[in-house]
Amino acid sequence: MSLFPVIVVFGLSFPPIFFELLLSLAIFWLVCRVLVPTGIYDFVWHPALFNTALYCCLFYLISRLFV
């Protein structure tokens, strides 16, 4: 259960987890922009799985921050 209430924008109600998802997506984008030039993806077996796991870890950390 999050500390933030449901937010209503133009008649659409957004649960607090929606904003946590957006924040984790923004951080994921920044982390990917840093990791690609460093060449880490050359050592990754399956980049799509790596990206999915990275996003899940970031979302978990951010959602734990707001609880």
From Swiss-Prot:
The keyword Zinc does not apply. The gene is aaeX. InterPro entries: DUF1656 (IPR012451). The chain crosses the membrane at residues 3-23, 47-67. Induction: Positively coregulated with aaeA and aaeB by AaeR. It is a multi-pass membrane protein. It is found in: Cell membrane. Its main location: membrane. Keywords: Cell membrane, Membrane, Transmembrane, Transmembrane helix. Belongs to the AaeX family. This is Protein AaeX. The keyword Cell membrane applies. GO terms for cellular component: plasma membrane. Pfam families: DUF1656 (PF07869).
